[in-house]
Amino acid sequence: MKTVTFLGCGSWGGALGKLLSEKGLDVTMWHRNLDVVNHLKDTRTHYLIPELIFPSGVEFTNNISSAIQSSEIIILAIPSQSIRDVITKNKSSFNKNHIIVNVSKGIEIDTLMTVSEVLNDVLDGNHRSVVTLSGQVMLKKS
């Protein structure tokens, strides 16, 4: 079974993580905030979308290096402005065999680089499989 780690579990990452878990993949969700991680573990409900309930198999952690190293597929669901910092700080946790899927939206403001370009820059072009999944923005009804 494929193992997937989501870096970021906001509304977009959370929805995708739930879907992949329901499709049979082993999913770990990383969030930098331990209080959010504890809420997710304790309630199995998303902190931004209470009607989003995670299956029992989804794991939650704030240990990013362990989450990266234990997975085959890394899905980047963090704000595009945070990608460079997060990847740079955790570069040693990645290996060239990871499949990296970017689902973050936008470009890096300071450089005008796409997330794929930022990843190539930070990871020195050493990763064979870097892809981007894009789609509509999720809007909340008012």
Residue ranges, per PLM feature:
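Rossmann-like NAD(P)(H) cofactor-binding subdomain of soluble oxidoreductases
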Residues: 61-64, 69, 73-142
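NAD(P)+-binding Rossmann beta1-loop-alpha1 motif at the extreme N-terminus of oxidoreductases
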Residues: 1-53, 58-62, 89, 110
